[in-house]
């Protein structure tokens, strides 16, 4: 054996590391069920599991001076493996989400609300980036090694979660000399989850005291419809190849093709390699969308007889991938590497939470009448954590998901990706020439934010304009 004996630690390192991550989530779940304030905090189990491991690793480092996850029992390079798991969790999770069959069609009004949700998502990224850049531009004159463009990580850590925060932190660290960039990104994402959990609970309690909402006291378990697991014309659950194995194979095949595209483009243009591999989830989404359309066409022409993709199982794959991404990302944080940035990080975290809260509150009040609070909790949770956090907060005010907010979250991904893509390009441009390019990026974000909000509030803006023109016409006629 080239790897040594089966009892050697390097054979078991990855298994023990993954087992530790999963065990931390089991412990976190037990603590949430047993401790009242944790149960009421709405903190996701994966986040709590990551915090438990971060605390253990930090205490170990304080006592021994060594990195806990780099012990031989974890293979000797556990921190690097945690970052790899975080990176791949993002791509695999998005591919599985994209492969899910579309569940329903909507009328014109609902399509407009879904578009508005996507526009709100991207506008949320932009306002986070604007305030984040303003903060880090100022602190870059005071804090050593802090680059002015670091503030863009706020919109990725809060708006898109651990995976993208790590991606851009890594790009800034490797390509632009941002010392501790990866840990900076992971910490911003962790602060986002805390903002979602703590801020969400505070506002929930406030609205409940005012009598504006009714919070569900009991955890509701929704019965699984067997048609979700074994739909019409789908391949059998236990055929010659297990149905779950088929779903995993599809997801990983899409991811492999995505790697080929990233590798090819990165080899053709070496300067874009880090950017290409930072877009692993986006390229995965595009390849998955293409495959989904090909399968739909083949099924329509009766070339493929059965449905191979199952939405229920794809949900389970994406849920597992995102759980692993979150717990691994938080556990990978090395606090000593970001000690010099703590004041900056705390200010970014607090300002990010406040400005996201205010902006989403305004949008939901004016654009989502009839389910303002449901839409708010879904959007606030998503724009400070992930889609899963948004669903957790939404469940507190809409336990059965009867409002349109849950569908808005699911179907807003396409407009969010389309309108959000320029933001990713701006984020890679921002650090190129230090303060100058960062200021240009800030100006672009402000201009794009204004443009998107004109589009978002198009009905209100043009309705008022038409009303004013009508009044002017009436005055002229009366004269």
For each feature predicted by the language model, list its residue ranges.
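Intrinsically disordered, low-complexity non-transmembrane regions of multi-pass membrane transporters
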Residues: 1-11, 18, 206-245, 296-308, ...
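Hydrophobic transmembrane alpha-helices of secondary-active transporters
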Residues: 24, 51-58, 80-110, 287-296, ...
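Interfacial helix-loop-helix linkers and transmembrane-helix boundary segments
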Residues: 35-42, 67-83, 100-119, 296-314, ...
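C-terminal transmembrane helix pair
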Residues: 325-329, 333-335, 345, 349-460
